[in-house]
Curated annotation (Swiss-Prot):
Cysteine-cysteine disulfides: none
Pfam families: FAM167
Organism, as annotated: Homo sapiens (Human)
Family membership: Belongs to the FAM167 (SEC) family.
Keywords: Coiled coil
Protein name from the UniProt record: Protein FAM167A
Coiled coil (residue ranges): 118-156
Region (Disordered): 1-26, 59-108
Keyword Coiled coil among UniProt keywords: yes
């Protein structure tokens, strides 16, 4: 009985598998921006999951050359050769053959699916939906970053405009005061009180309507 070959196609190969991928790869742009800014997630849940993943020991299959090497080492040492786990040509009992006595064998059917093709189609559909969700999240994050940068620029422009206005008003006050002092000195009756001078209120400020007397 020949082993059936499974041909896995690309996610975007089928037209009817789901919605088409967006023309702009926002996820790739987000990854490039993350690497450029050297951003790393430090959420406790992600760190715990990463620690568990690194501590987990994955069962790797034993290479076929190891039993032969153990036999040669046993012969060189003068000891009895170590027998392999199974004889040559003897196949390990599969789970399907072991469970034949318990329940009847259902050929060509998987749990929850009628065939392997149906399972592959479902898996392809799930992967397509996950890719679209990743693209949407990446697009939202990129848009949010753009909005934040726009707000920062607007705030900086407002501060710069306010600074320019203050400098302009200060120059105008100096020019007006210089003209007044050159003509005739201000009388003490027209000068403002000391508390107003301490907080920066002058006659020129009042004339320019920058402060309210109410």
């Amino acid at each position: 009985m020949s082993v059936p070959q499974i041909h896995v196609e690309e996610v975007g190969a089928e037209e009817g598998a789901g919605a088409a991928a967006p023309p702009d790869d926002h996820l790739r742009s987000l990854k490039a921006l993350t690497e450029k800014l050297r951003l790393e997630t430090r959420r406790p849940s992600y760190l715990e999951w990463q620690a568990r993943l690194e501590e987990h020991t994955w069962p790797f299959p034993r290479p076929a050359a190891e039993p032969q090497a153990s036999l040669e080492e046993g012969e060189r040492g003068g000891q009895e050769p170590l027998l392999p786990l199974r004889e040559a040509g003897q196949h390990p009992p599969s789970a399907r053959s072991a469970s034949q006595g318990a329940r009847p064998l259902s050929t060509g059917k998987l749990e929850g699916f009628q065939s392997i093709d149906e399972a592959i189609a479902w898996l392809r559909k799930e992967l397509t939906e996950m890719r679209l969700q990743d693209q949407q999240l990446a697009r939202q994050l990129m848009r949010l970053r753009g909005d934040i940068n726009k707000l920062k620029i607007e705030h900086t422009c407002r501060l710069h405009r306010r600074m320019l206005n203050d400098a302009t008003y200060e120059l105008e006050e100096r020019d007006e005061l210089a003209d007044l002092f050159c003509d005739s000195p201000l009388a003490s009756s027209f000068s403002l009180s000391t508390p107003l001078k301490l907080i920066g209120v002058t006659k020129m400020n009042i004339n320019s309507r920058r402060f309210s007397l109410c």
